[in-house]
């Protein structure tokens, strides 16, 4: 589907290892979503979900059809069989304790570019 509700938002995900540089592991776009947000909202409500003003609706993993646009480490590392090489030479099949995951997004047209900033989190060991 390629309608006007499929927003053109560039997305980027990076992993920063402890005391190291970050590596961009995914560049995708929100327009790659199979269902747009209007369709996802309709799907929720038709199945009885009581959506109310202020509720947060999340899209889930956003993946493209090219390897650089895969949206999860399971896809990026091909179920752990193809590790990615980090800037220091170490490899990752999945995210490790101590890694920082960084996500960024921007949208633009011919006249203006809007940045959504970045969100990042440090992956802590399980208790």
Question: Which residue ranges define each predicted feature?
Answer:
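Catalytic-pocket segment enriched in acidic/His residues
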Residues: 1-127
